[in-house]
Amino acid sequence: VYIEPWNSDIEAFMDLRLNQGDEEARCRDLFSALWIPDLFMERVQEGGKWSLFSPDDTKDLPELYGDAFKEAYERYEKEGKATKTMDAHVLWQRILRSQVETGTPYMLYKDPCNEKSNQKNLGTIKCSNLCTEIVEYTDKDETAVCNLASIALPKFVNPKTKKFNYQSLIDVSRTVTRNLNKVIDRNFYPTEPARKSNMRHRPIGIGVQGLADTYILMDMAFDSEEARALNHKIFEAIYYGSVLESMEEAKKYGAYETFEGSPASKGILQFDMWEPSKYPLTLNWDALKEDVKTHGMRNSLLLAPMPTASTSQILGNNECIEPYTSNMYLRRTLAGEFVVINKHLIKELISLGIWNNETKNAIIRDNGSVQNLVIPDELKAKYKTVWEMSQKVLIDQAADRGRFVCQSQSLNLFLEDPNTSKISSMHMYAWKQGLKTGMYYLRTRPKARAVQFTVDPATSLEAAKAACSLENKDECTMCSA
């Protein structure tokens, strides 16, 4: 359920998933998300007041964003229509406390989601999906649908030269785009509004899996400048290939029905809607933009990096865009449980001649960390877990790739010892970077861990599995692609 923070039900909404309190006011199986206008973040930042309204009295607010929303909101404040006025910081703290306790609500920013959308000519987008990567227009006559696929990035790394094959990635992105168009045409639609939406706007969502594995294969630490630059080039290549193929499909079959009036119809692509990046574009975008203006595109939306919680296990990749959470752990999904061991680490430790029971027990004892092993510093950097790196790294990389992501991305954030101050800083930074999804889940580590009574391999592995499974509650497999 998505709600905007001006809604008079917001305070009760924040309590729905809490562990304590009135059971009649709890709904812990409901996934909660905020659809946040920039005005709220500005009021929090400046220490201002925040007004709550009944949706019955302010029926146009859900339809507005940007300056139009601000003008209407402030007019309703002056007219005295607020049901309650409070310090914006008070509501903000309530949101943060809920995230400390439950990992939710998800944080999505209404203005960037609309202002940076190729569907902005259709109307106002009012929500995302369960995994926060789909941002599509929907109304009473149309149910937004997306057609997903993920690309296994490690397949494009040459194991001998440790070079990345960008041209091959462009070619595969074109193939995926072509195939997803066939899915749209041949799919079974359970409802007419779903079929109507999919056929009119033809959105697709291309994501990735194994980004962390790709960095490792190329001898890069996740939090290195080289990895950040690679991330930018990878997503530029995927976006280029998908735009190119969507244009070629439009040549054959015609542009999607609502293409005219979209940003793309005017030669405006996703990266044109963002602030300039520190990294230059490397592909021939000018010529492609002219082709798009001439021939159109077959799809309104193209990229949407999703969680890949289950499908990444098929090829043994780390999921989606995330760092490794541990070098040895149990991954629990709705489809079952998977013991995950970092295969790249084992290979390197074997080559150094130090992979043995003692090393394995040391990794288990340190909850999947290698920072206390006697190994070269470059290996310690390369095999850092997400708990051992700044979350600014994840946000920066999300913003860099966001310039090529025309929907949004499932961006989890991780804090070993969360508090409201740290979370507030992360949210403010993500918002200022222009992200559409500021946070999917806030992942934390359990306070209690299995006591390591023994270094016996079997016993300690079971203990580690039990401890690590606490960190990986049931994952959503709907967006596995």
Positions of predicted regions on the chain:
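Acidic, low-complexity intrinsically disordered tails
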Residues: Q452-A481
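Catalytic or ion-translocation cores adjacent to nucleophile or general acid/base/metal-coordination motifs
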Residues: D15-E42, R228-K233, E322-I341
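Glycine- and acidic
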Residues: G21-R26, E74-K81, A152-Q167, Y189-M199, ...
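Internal maturation/activation junctions in enzymes
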Residues: V172-R195, M199, P203, A221-T308, ...
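Catalytic alpha/beta core of large soluble enzyme barrels
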Residues: T132-Y137, L180-D185, K278-T282, D291-R298, ...
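A glycine-rich phosphate-binding loop feature that marks nucleotide/adenosyl-phosphate handling sites
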Residues: Y2-D9, W35-P37, D56-E63, Y109-L122, ...
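Function-dense linear segments that define catalytic or interfacial modules
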Residues: S98-N198, P203, V208-M218, N317-H344, ...
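Active-site cavity-forming subdomains of large catalytic enzyme subunits
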Residues: V1-Y166, Y189-P193, S242-S262, L288-E290, ...
